[in-house]
Amino acid sequence: VLRLAVVGIDGSGKSTTTLRVLQVLCRYRTVIKPGRPNLVGDQGRLSPYWEPAGTFFELLFRNVDHTRQRLLIGWTRILFVTYAAFMERWMVRRFKPEVVLTSRCPILDPAIYQEVYYPGLSRRMTLQRRMEMTRLLTRVPPRTGYFFLRTPIPVAMDRILRRIERLYPTSLMHREYWLHLHENPHALQIIAQRFDRALSLARTQYGSGIMEIDTTTRNEEEAAGIITDTIGKLPMEFSEPLLVKV
């Protein structure tokens, strides 16, 4: 199984890019996407799987995020990571896919975002140790490869704010009300730096391949095209710690 992840800071277009890749990839490979939402693709058809869980987490995150309480928000993310890891293991057994593609990494992302939501704990543990702890807790294998959407902070913030205006056009609340706690330039800068380090560790520790895609001027459609073409050329036994920048 090729286990691949599209990663990047908030505002990089991970979710939209991943969805567009899946829509094309399912035409010639069996693919699953565990998470929010769970998706199964085969023979050109992409279908949701166990939708109530996705709805539950959407409502949970929306309500908890508005409390602005770091520990409470952090615990909901731990719950989701545990759930997503379980779904990956279950869906791999159930559907026997050729490709597992996620819009976050169940190992890297929790280790990185701990620094925002649990700064005290993060100061006592290196990023490498946090990654290894997350890998052991989730019980999912390291990713075969990563597609890192490199996005400048101003571009990411602009996309985040435009997303909020699109999702909540009639809201009486100020747009900052809808921002996640880490959706600010300072936090995003820290997250971006940690991704660089985490991906480097993934190459050396897990042998993961990395493709870095500059999304400064590329939209989600263009990034998805690059990713889809690359996956289509990967042999099922691919396992090389390559680093490619486009």
Where in this protein do the model-derived segments appear?
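Hydrophobic anchor at the beta1->P-loop junction of P-loop NTPases
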Residues: 6
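P-loop (Walker A) phosphate-binding loop of NTP-binding proteins
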Residues: 9
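Conserved lysine of the Walker
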Residues: 14
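Hydrophobic positions on the alpha1 helix immediately C-terminal to the Walker A/P-loop
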Residues: 17
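Post-Walker A helix-loop "phosphate-sensing" segment adjacent to the P-loop in P-loop NTPases
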Residues: 23-33
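ATP-dependent small-molecule kinase phosphotransfer cores
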Residues: 39-127
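A glycine- and Lys/Arg-enriched "phosphate-lid" helix/loop adjacent to the NTP-binding pocket
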Residues: 108-194
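NTP-dependent small-molecule kinase module
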Residues: 158-246
